[in-house]
Amino acid sequence: MKYHFSRGLRDDDKQHLLAALDCFDIVAYFETSNGKKKLFGFGVKEQSQSPKELKGDIVFGGYAFDDQVIANSKLMNGFWFIPSIFVAINDGKIRFESDEISDFDQWLMQFLFSKQKAVTIRRTFEEKDWQSRTRNLINKLNNDAILEKVVFGRQQQYALSAKIKMSYLIQKMASQDNTYHVILKRHDEIFISATPERLVKVTGGNLKTAAVAGTIRRGKTVYEDKEFGEYLLNSVKNKREHQYVVNNIFQKLQGMTTNLNVPKQPILLKNKQMQHLYTPVTADVNTAYSIVDIVQRLHPTPALGGVPQIQALEYIQTHEQSPRGLFAAPIGYYTADNSGEFVVGIRSMYINQMVNTATLFAGAGIVSDSDATQEFQETSLKFKPMRQLLKGYTYDD
């Protein structure tokens, strides 16, 4: 028997729910970019490495970026699950579904928020040759008749003196505006993303996606911020990089959708540290296709892989130092009525609580006229959202 319950949202509900995230081995958290909708999945009824094998009222999960395998990980190579307990917060109301728990308030009140213990953080890994490898890539792009763009990833790793609570990380993410806040946890493994980029949303057959490519930092003053934004809107390199993504989305959605609408010019999408070129795309989904079909079709966009796709992915697999796992991959949820939403796992971090390490991810779109030093600075900027989550701890670099 499935239990359903709903009521008005109380002031302390979210605190109890955040505390609950630290008490289950398998959980998911999905918060929309406007902060109005928050979805929680606790425990597991069914799980799989492929979403095609799961049919439930709601399924959470994520694909791996590609077919490279991360050794000893049961999360980063792709993971999907139907939660045993589902909670949604939306429009000032809280909704609960479970096959196991009949009294929601009694269940919720057992989870008490506790303070994060002091943690010392020490950087243990940095790709010191990244700029050199990026210069090699730029040289190849200038001498290769086929390869046009490669999104080149970069990683940093930190040793943690103790476990970091998921509840604490989500609280810290609240300062990251205009971004989705997404977490997947499987036992001692946690993937967390504060991503500005939606891959696709489907509701009642209506599809929304967007091209997000081309980045510059926020200004320190209103005038400087506007100046940077104008520079980005008029940057030949960034506009070309952005158009790769727009064209790719248009081509991939043809045949799967009708009423496909793609604006001719991008606008600016601004979040705490960065501003991006942004083109929203809408369409109606053909009934023959599920949201999972569309996710598989769209991934990876040129904002995550490159152009042409096959050659760019081959370069990434050969020249990036470590597999990406869930980094830059689709993460989200879908429902039994073929609705759902997926984001791409950028501005992200992987925490392994078994060995207390945190791996941060960033990437930059490299084209023939890129500058390796500038791209290094851009990736350093893209580490900031996750570095911000670790801010306040003691660093021992």
Q: Positions of the model-derived regions?
A:
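Contiguous alpha-helical scaffold segments within structured protein domains
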Residues: 2-9, 92, 102, 106-125, ...
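Short Lys/Arg-enriched alpha/beta "domain-start" segment
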Residues: 1-55, 156-166
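A residue-level signal for conserved active-site and pocket-lining positions in enzyme catalytic cores
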Residues: 61, 87, 145, 200, ...
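A short glycine-rich, hydrophobically flanked beta-strand micro-motif that places a catalytic Asp/Glu
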Residues: 61, 150, 182-185, 324-332
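Short, solvent-exposed loop/turn elements at beta->coil junctions and helix N-caps
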Residues: 8, 186-189, 330-335
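Conserved hydrophobic core element of enzyme catalytic domains
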Residues: 281, 285-397
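Non-catalytic accessory segments adjacent to catalytic cores
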Residues: 44-159, 164-165, 258, 391, ...
